């Protein structure tokens, strides 16, 4: 799913530079998306002969990708990966530690500030781009069945768009309408009882006795007293009768005028006992059914974020970090962004895209209690590794790297050779439109014609942009691409 504009934003943000035997450029373009959620790093001389190029494809907001871009270079530098006996293990630990750092209280405050800065203030009653995105998401989700929405948000809490979608579609209208009617009936009944209160004291006594009996039998006395317990993730909603149906139903023990003979009292008492017993059984079933509903798929709706999306919990970013040294290149990747090396015209993948349907990813997701539906984790994220997204990382029995969504990167170390020409690091907005070899051919051809790295990056974004949003979404995503060439003459 995604929110799109009526026409793409094709203005590009650019960065370029050179030094220490290489030249580089980066282009980022918003495209058809309502918001630009990508971020990147181009850091020459991160340490001595090491340079860092990273692409961070954000989702659910810009805050985690921007935070990563601002903090990760120093975070890696402090760990002195270049001195590590096992560089891969060092970088993997650094990524997981950084993900832990993201959920720290101070970091969460900073993420919120970043998110707030990215929301333009409203003027003249016009909605900002974030509101527009929410509006479009709500419209899209309104056409999705309730059960599917519950699956989608089951492990990640429920956002404001989901609640709006429920109301827009009316999937919960049956129970809610019944509850509203019951509440109205209860209010009318309360009014009637108040009017009769001074006229007939004995009726009041009967009602109080009935309520006392309900408490002794274990039935709830009033609304709002059912227990909400923390529950595991569920994939389907369990339909149950609203508790208010039983609670607001007229009591068989209420009496009419509060006057009865001893014989009538005995008969009524027997009838009342039988009726109350049946009602107690029904109440117990209703209460159990309601608790099952709370303990099941509706738990995120009732116990989740209360409609407010939390930065770092409901947002995240991929991270494809390319560390270029004097004689080798190291890539640490978490997510579906990608780094590719051109070696004598041939594409050499320096990373592997992480998708939920991959065997390794599927096994971890299932082990953490998650599900995969239509290529999405719990029907939500269509990727399986990322910084942030801590709403998917709530299994208390597992460490961060073992959660449904993990920041643990794959690390590849590749020795550089004289045949190596350039490296491309980009988000899936590029790779969904072109294969690795297609990108290498495209870039190599332009470089051979004398184009600069910046011109190459611009052209690649334009080539991948879709003409419309009528297709499957290919070419409609944010685009960020970094191209780094090796200057052999300066070495």
From Swiss-Prot:
UniProt biased composition (Basic and acidic residues): 112-125
Query: Is Metal-binding there in the keyword field?
Result: yes
According to the UniProt entry, which residue ranges have a biased composition of type Acidic residues? 173-192, 260-294
CC cofactor: Mg(2+); Mn(2+)
Segments carrying the region annotation (Disordered) are: 112-136, 170-294
Which amino acid positions bind Mn(2+) 1, per UniProt? 57-58
Instruction: Name the EC number(s).
Output: 3.1.3.16
Q: Which InterPro entries match?
A: PP2C, PP2C_BS, PPM-type-like_dom_sf, PPM-type_phosphatase-like_dom
Q: Could you say which residues bind Mn(2+) 2 here?
A: 57, 428, 477
Protein's GO biological process: signal transduction
What is this enzyme's catalytic activity, as reactions?
O-phospho-L-seryl-[protein] + H2O = L-seryl-[protein] + phosphate; O-phospho-L-threonyl-[protein] + H2O = L-threonyl-[protein] + phosphate
Write down the top EC class of this protein.
Answer: hydrolase
Q: Mind telling me which SUPFAM superfamilies this protein's record contains?
A: PP2C-like
* Alphabetically ordered keywords of this record: Hydrolase, Magnesium, Manganese, Metal-binding, Protein phosphatase
CDD domains found in the cross-reference section: PP2Cc
Which Gene3D superfamilies does the record match to this protein?
Answer: PPM-type phosphatase domain
Could you tell me which residue ranges the PPM-type phosphatase domain spans? Answer: 23-486
Q: What Gene Ontology molecular function terms does this protein carry?
A: metal ion binding; protein serine/threonine phosphatase activity
Please report which protein family the annotation says this sequence is part of.
Belongs to the PP2C family.
Q: What is this protein called?
A: Protein phosphatase ppm-1.G
Q: Which gene encodes it?
A: ppm-1.G
